[in-house]
Structures are given as C-alpha cells and as structure tokens.
Amino acid sequence: AGIAHIKETKENKDFYYKVNRDLAYETARKAKGEAVRQFIFLSSMSVYGIENGVIDKNTPLNPNTAYGKSKLEAEELIKKLEDESFIIAIIRPPMVYGKGCRGNYPRLAGLALKTPIFPKVDNKRSMIYIDNLAEFVKQLIDNQSGGLFFPQNAEYVNTSEMVKVIAEAHGKKVVMTKLFNPLINLMKRNNTVNKLFGDLVYEEGLINNNQHNGFINFEESINLTEN
C-alpha cells in the first residue's frame, strides 16, 4: 500500500498519511494477526529530506514532504509490531527506474531521444532498476531477513552516462559537452535541475554484503527498460 508521484497539495496531504502510514500499518497489523512470519515495508530515501550529498548511518531523518513524513511515521509504527515471531524488514530504496516507472527517468529518456547535445556533468546518484529491487526483496524473503536496508545498483549512476546509454538503446547518438555546466551550476537551486544533475548517494558502507547477487548491470537494465 502506498502512493507516490502525485503533486502534493494542502487538499491531498491527509491522503498521503491515510495510505502510506495508516493503511500500511493496518496491513502489517493484519499480517501479524494472521501469523505471517515476515513483513517487508517499502519506505523511501525521502525520509532523509535531503536533495544533495551522501547519506550514511549518521544522516538524520528529516523528511520535508508529506510523502517522506508519512513513510517515516509508517516505519515507526510498523517497527513497534516486531517481535520474535514477526520479522520486520524496512527498505529505503533510492530512485527506482524501469519500464513504466514514473518520476525523473521518463524526463531523461525524453531528452535523450529529442536532443542531439546534452551537458556532460560529473555527478553521482544512487538508483535501482525495478527488477533488481524485486530480486533484492526475493532475497530478503528467501533468507527471512529483518532490519533496515538500502538497496541500489552495483554502481552509482551518472546522469550524462544514463542519457548516453538511453540514446544508444534507440540507435541514436548524443554529443556530450561541458559548455552548459556553468549555467547548470547556477540553476541547481531549482529542484528539478538539482534532481537531475546533483549528487545524492547512499554511502557504500550502508550496502549489505552480497546485496548485488543476481542483479542486472546498468547498461543491460537501460536496454531492458527502453526495448
């Protein structure tokens, strides 16, 4: 149970809490009452409330949107249900991409197919391909694991490289140039520009051993998404 990618307004703020917090908690409570052994809650990187930088074990939880706040409150409620007979696994994935996914990926894909020139920016972002996320959840179930998890692809993603690979998946070529970089740096106060070209990663120390077993590599994940 959850909602995302809906523009937040004063009118729909309560809806985020009803679905992402209340419904998620009631689902977990029902599962425990039915003697389910493990409950996996899909939370979000949004619980940190930051748009730039490196997230590590000391990064404070400070969500600044109804989405992030509702996810964090759900985590806190669901965690209270945990005991020896009810395992709780909380996942905080970064941006998820794949066929049919919403968010920033479709914007980048659209740019990759329309523009012959794109900024060459040396940024890094944690992302995860939807099938890799599914594989990660499968591993949690197979191992009956509990705790807090930060799944991501085996490599950080560079925005310029992603656009290049998307274009190549369609037989197109995009020329990368640093000519636009000064303008991009000035525009990073814009939330959309910052999400595309800023840095936002999970520190590698948060990644669990053997997490990437069975994961699809970045280039193949783009080809599967685009074709």
What residues fall within each predicted segment?
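Flexible, glycine-rich beta-alpha linker
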Residues: 48, 89-107
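SDR active-site strand-loop-helix element
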Residues: 1, 39-45, 91-93
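NAD(P)H-binding glycine-rich loop region in Rossmannoid oxidoreductase-like domains
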Residues: 1-30, 48, 52
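Conserved Rossmann-fold NAD(P)-dependent oxidoreductase catalytic core, especially the SDR/UDP-sugar
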Residues: 25-66
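Active-site Tyr-X1-5-Lys
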Residues: 62-89
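A conserved pocket-lining segment of Rossmann-fold NAD(P)-dependent short-chain dehydrogenase/reductase
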Residues: 110-128, 132, 139, 150
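Glycine-rich NAD(P)-binding loop of the Rossmann-fold in SDR/ketoreductase-type enzymes
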Residues: 15-26, 61, 65, 69-72, ...
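Mid/C-terminal beta-alpha module of Rossmann-like enzyme folds, strongest
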Residues: 136-192, 216-218, 222-226
